[in-house]
Amino acid sequence: LTLGGTGKTPLVTWTARQCLAGGSQPAVVSRGYGAGPGQTSDEAAELALVLPGVAHVADRDRVAAAAVAVSHGARAIVLDDGFQHRRLARDLDIVAVDATDPFGCGHLFPRGMLREPLGGLARAHAVVLTRADAIEPDRRREIVAALADLCGRRGPQVWAQAAHAPHRLRTTSGRELPLDAVRGQRVAAFCGIGNPAAFRRTLERLGAC
């Protein structure tokens, strides 16, 4: 429901892997933000790295993109960033809510970070509270209760929580390092994600300075 990094890409990756595990060949469909004609977005490059063998079709027209994916053998379509894209019928709506900013400053963009009123969450079948490990358990319960109250009786049937934690470091040459390799080290951080503050907190938890 909010702009910025809510952890959608890891959730898309997980969902596609669940489709594969269940025997359905998935394809990821997205708008392709940040890429011009003939170019590949950074998100598409990341998905290609973590989901080898899974097609990623980017098009502003998600219906056309889904048709292309199906024509190439996809049995399941994972629509990235498509909760507000209602032209494409879907079987399951999963919404990611960032635990560190669940209400998008309480206002629609540009005054706040909401794409639509919070009550729109009632259309979701499942809600995943991302970065849940970044807040206290009592706060998690408060957030879920507040969101459920906004949704009313027709709200999501499944409420889940996800922790975002790195499990290895990789150098530009492809060499893998243990997480403690940055402990106590002075680090200059660069990122291209929607929530750079979350990236900074991750480095701080790893002991970088």
Regions found by a protein language model. Give the residues of each.
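Redox- and metal-dependent alpha/beta enzyme cores, enriched for Fe-S-associated oxidoreductases
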Residues: 175, 182-209
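Walker A (P-loop) phosphate-binding motif
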Residues: 1-35, 134
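Hydrophobic anchor at the start of a short beta-strand
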Residues: 25-26, 93, 159, 187, ...
